[in-house]
């Protein structure tokens, strides 16, 4: 079995080593559920990596948003450079699910934009899970959504070996069955091309290399990887396993059976509408499904094919849909599931099923979809935790749910290798809180440090930002309408010192790593609620736990139970770390995180901004520009700069239209 190898100049600290040993021993003893309770800045990610190394199991790491998933993917790629670290999030740049609003008689068509690089990474994850053992997949909630049958996907592979007898015509037909398309003019992922006795295949999950097959009659005479852009031979291989272009590709027999089953359900549903005298729904469903059946028969797919997933995967009504978990389980080996920031992730998993079902029930009721579409759904929480996996829930503030689930197997990690103490906490009257905060913030900013302020309302945030700007503070407001790209720009600007204070309502998300922030202010801290609960307050306080001068001010006229619990927990941890530092002579130091590595600048090339010149340019010259842009697009995607890669992709598409 392949072994996980950690690449790091650090070794686990005493506290990390203790947590790793306890977790590994617990899992090996047969305890399915375990909790790592680790404070902010204690190195939970490094602990997770060491658990993976010692257990030596394929691992799925899940978190609740794409930003954290990207951060974790980058970190684990660094920890395991010799192993297969994969990335599995939604491949949509934009996604609007189909929906129907009965009171307005308004049907909203599904609209989406697929990010080809994210799609490639998803395919790479499933392909490598079937081929290797040393696989870590970092995923968002996408891992809970339906995928094709892994057994069907595995059955669609093409096994190639040097010297084998292989008829070229049969090879090309097999490639078409696997979803590959012939394209001799423009060679892209998911394509193949033929030039005499040479067949080039661009696997859908490869980055910038393809595979070349050279035949001598019906014998596979040579096989090697080559760089697509430069057409250079890079690596000879004697064996190669080619996977299909999608997890939803099915064999001919399965497709024929699926079409028959869909036709039977359609007949049954149409009879229901006819009996109920609902002629509009009757006609609507008949027209939509018959069109889909025609497309499935002729092309093997159709728009919204996922709504027929139950039939295409051969499952029964109500069965748990196939998901990424099944690609781990198909080998029959033990695997590990790590749920990062579990106090947020698990409640989100719980809510996914209900939201998806309520939308689809309306579509089914009004004849836009067959009832079987309800089986194309995310996993329920009880299905999620019933998988044949070992679970590790990771959080600074785990909920009672995961603590109960683990039956006491909760392992703390509350010492920071940097010696940093939890922030000092001050409770100050909320009378004149705006003026008091202004004075405190000015002192912090004068030291070259940053300030985060959390308020309860959008109006308060806007007014506070405007007021402080008038008083000369460089401050910005992070509101709920900004997208992930703008959010990262704001965080980058704060870290670089372009402004000194960031104001928001729920901006202090889990995993936000800002070593420059030394003051966190919570206005109206005594207003009990979701944003002022014990968990939220501890998470908010943690944003000041990466700076040696970290301080939290709670503006309140009374101390609520949530405040008291959060303060008591933080002060106990502060004392524990302080005693440890004193015992071992550790001097606290601020955490460090390389700004350029963590937040890369967008720098789109300016090769294509003069349309008139490009139109007059010879096709061969335009092809050179496309080649250069494609190279930059692949490089951007490799560096996880997906917005930049998407912009380059769009420009390439424009150039090809000229």
Curated annotation (Swiss-Prot):
Notes concerning its domains: The beta-hairpin motif is involved in DNA binding.
Keyword Nucleotide-binding: yes
Entry keywords, A to Z: ATP-binding, Cytoplasm, DNA damage, DNA excision, DNA repair, Excision nuclease, Helicase, Hydrolase, Nucleotide-binding, SOS response
Main location: cytoplasm
Family: Belongs to the UvrB family.
Domain UVR, first and last residues per copy: 623-658
SUPFAM superfamilies: C-terminal UvrC-binding domain of UvrB, P-loop containing nucleoside triphosphate hydrolases
Gene3D superfamilies hit by this protein: P-loop containing nucleotide triphosphate hydrolases, UVR domain
GO cellular component: cytoplasm; excinuclease repair complex
Residues the entry annotates as binding ATP: 38-45
Positions occupied by motif Beta-hairpin: 91-114
Native source organism of the sequence: Campylobacter fetus subsp. fetus (strain 82-40)
Domain (Helicase ATP-binding): residue spans on this chain: 25-182
Pfam families assigned to the protein according to its UniProt record, in alphabetical order: Helicase_C (PF00271), ResIII (PF04851), UVR (PF02151), UvrB (PF12344), UvrB_inter (PF17757)
GO molecular function, one term: helicase activity
Name used for this protein in its record: UvrABC system protein B
Keyword DNA repair: yes
GO biological process: nucleotide-excision repair; SOS response
Domain Helicase C-terminal: 433-596
Domain of life: Bacteria
